Amino acid sequence: MSDEGERVVLRVYDLSNGMARTMSQQFLGMQVDIVPHTGVFVYGREWFFSGGIQSAPSWGMMPMHEEIVLGQTGVPLEIFAEFIEGVREQYTAATYNLATNNCNHFSNAVVEFLAGVQVPERILNLPEQIMATPMGQAFMPMLAQMGGAMDPLGGGGGGGGGGGGGGGGGG
């Protein structure tokens, strides 16, 4: 990684506050260490999806589980702002879906645009892994019907960034 450009950092939070680690094996029949919410820290702000695209100097609504430096970007902030405006309608309260359009999917779109990399599969694929369990199959259709109401952060309109939560399978 060169020293030029902005660092692209994935910030990972645990929406379960540790409960997934202690209860998932018994409940799901598989070990899930966290229920991840992600945001991307770049240009001095954290960009996340919660009811819409949001950004803040530092999110801080819950303790951070880990930070993953995914690379550097040479994309100017102005071009990134155009990207955000271009995807804003894809990431709204109405389009939120626990399994297919959550904070982790938004973060993935952002890091692909900025650095040409992806969010780690252990985060991005967690909903599919949970849906493969008997309990996941029982609950996911009900959760999917609830749509945007399932955004665990209960975010409202847009700010300008990425990442938003999703109980059971990530943000």
Task: Please tell me what each predicted stretch does.
Residues 114-126:
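Short conserved catalytic/interaction loops centered on acidic-Pro-aromatic/His motifs
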